[in-house]
């Protein structure tokens, strides 16, 4: 599937800072293990994509902006990045929304994917190298399910009408290591987030669906274990490991995906391929609320990127509004967030038109690198530029950025993805 155009990312002079990120599994900030800088071996990064029926709300955008920062810092450190993202273009929520709106689910998916692409392009988010729909990966999923069945890590329920295939929660002895949740929390989230603990015939209530046997009115594909369609988690396991290898560098997404989705995606891959960890780093971005209320489809309080840009708000201001708080925390978005970001953007531009002190400009670039490489400390990075701008007399500024100002302008573009 086609992604979207790649924004130009300026190359910066000076010394980059190696990236450290919080790992959800280990519960600590540590250095991201990467191939040597400048080598032909890329950093492998997989980020879960959208289910295309409500694109692109600010919660989506905040997650992809966090991983865009990671991509940019890796580029600054002279790493190539093999970024993979999926699209869950065959799933129950998509079917339900299409039925509600009286449209074909394929048409709804196509329109929302196109909107998502345009929003990502507007926000200057670097696209994935591989942008893969679940439908495109059916053969890969079938092969992985077959492997899990052959390994005894999966089973077919005894149900003549709907012989679904499930993964055994006991297939690996480390289940739960990524989320660090206790059994009660896992059971609660499994039931709330797409699981089917009461499905008759399962060996364990938390065994995860790998292959849903064909039902009337649903799309299905032939397989050695009967016609059907993929479960949610196995799609990501197959798409990621078939492109990045059985164990890769970074798996990420929103914090609501930690369990069950990411826990099971990792467990399926580890059981199928016999690896210790699917990813060396598990990275998760917090949720977005609006005016103190969790932003969600069910509440109908979603803020959409396309609405903000259509209203004349600059993508750079949207980025700065999201970056005002740390990516791992749950953040609130309101009119003040956007107004503050727009004022910040204007202040930085004024400073770049009047800056003359080269040493100060070089220093703020160093500070940007240091803050962003320290687990994406965007509040610190923004404060560093604020402090630089506050020290500049802008009364005699010109209409164009000064030579010195362009040093900072390039760094803000390259590292924060914000064009002044």
From Swiss-Prot:
Its cofactor is Zn(2+). SUPFAM superfamilies: Nucleotidylyl transferase. A motif ('HIGH' region) lies at residues 50-60. It is an enzyme of class 6 (ligase). One of its GO terms (molecular function) is zinc ion binding. The keyword Metal-binding applies. L-cysteinyl-5'-AMP binds at residues 48-51, 63, 86-88, 232, 254-256, 288. Monomer. Catalyzes the ATP-dependent condensation of GlcN-Ins and L-cysteine to form L-Cys-GlcN-Ins. This is L-cysteine:1D-myo-inositol 2-amino-2-deoxy-alpha-D-glucopyranoside ligase. It comes from Corynebacterium glutamicum (strain R).
């Amino acid at each position: 599937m086609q992604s979207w155009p790649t924004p130009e990312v300026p190359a910066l002079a000076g010394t980059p800072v190696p990236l450290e990120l919080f790992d959800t599994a280990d519960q600590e900030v540590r250095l991201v293990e990467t191939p040597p800088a400048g080598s032909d071996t890329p950093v492998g990064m997989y980020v879960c994509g959208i289910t295309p029926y409500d694109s692109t709300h600010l919660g989506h955008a905040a997650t992809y902006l966090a991983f865009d920062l990671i991509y940019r810092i890796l580029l600054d450190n002279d790493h190539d990045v093999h970024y993979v993202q999926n699209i869950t273009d065959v799933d129950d929520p998509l079917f339900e929304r299409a039925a509600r709106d009286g449209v074909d689910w394929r048409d709804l998916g196509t329109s929302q994917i196109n909107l998502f692409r345009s929003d990502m392009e507007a926000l200057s988010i670097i696209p994935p190298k591989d942008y893969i729909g679940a439908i495109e990966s059916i053969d890969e999923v079938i092969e992985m399910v077959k492997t899990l069945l052959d390994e005894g890590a999966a089973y077919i329920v005894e149900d003549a009408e709907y012989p679904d295939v499930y993964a055994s929660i006991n297939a690996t002895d480390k289940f739960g290591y990524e989320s660090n949740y206790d059994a009660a929390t896992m059971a609660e989230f499994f039931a709330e987030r797409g699981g089917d603990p009461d499905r008759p015939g399962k060996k364990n209530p938390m065994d995860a669906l790998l292959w849903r046997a064909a039902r009337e009115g649903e799309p299905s594909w032939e397989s050695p274990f009967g016609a059907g369609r993929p479960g949610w988690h196995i799609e990501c396991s197959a798409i990621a490991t078939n492109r990045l290898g059985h164990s890769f560098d970074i798996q990420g997404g929103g914090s609501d995906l930690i369990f069950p989705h990411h826990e099971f995606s990792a467990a399926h891959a580890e059981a199928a391929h016999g690896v210790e960890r699917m990813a060396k780093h598990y990275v998760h971005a917090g949720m977005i609320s609006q005016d103190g209320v969790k932003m969600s489809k069910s509440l109908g309080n979603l803020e959409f990127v396309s609405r903000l840009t259509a209203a004349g708000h600059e993508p750079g201001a949207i980025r700065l509004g999201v970056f005002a708080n740390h990516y791992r925390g749950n953040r609130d978005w309101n009119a003040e967030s956007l107004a503050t970001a727009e004022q910040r953007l204007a202040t930085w531009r004024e400073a770049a038109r009047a800056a003359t002190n080269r040493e100060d400009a070089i220093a703020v670039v160093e500070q940007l690198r240091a803050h962003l490489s320290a687990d994406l400390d965007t509040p610190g990075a923004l404060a560093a530029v604020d402090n630089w701008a506050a020290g500049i007399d802008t009364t005699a500024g010109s209409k164009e950025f000064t030579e010195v100002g362009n040093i900072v302008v390039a760094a803000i573009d390259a590292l924060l993805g914000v064009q002044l």
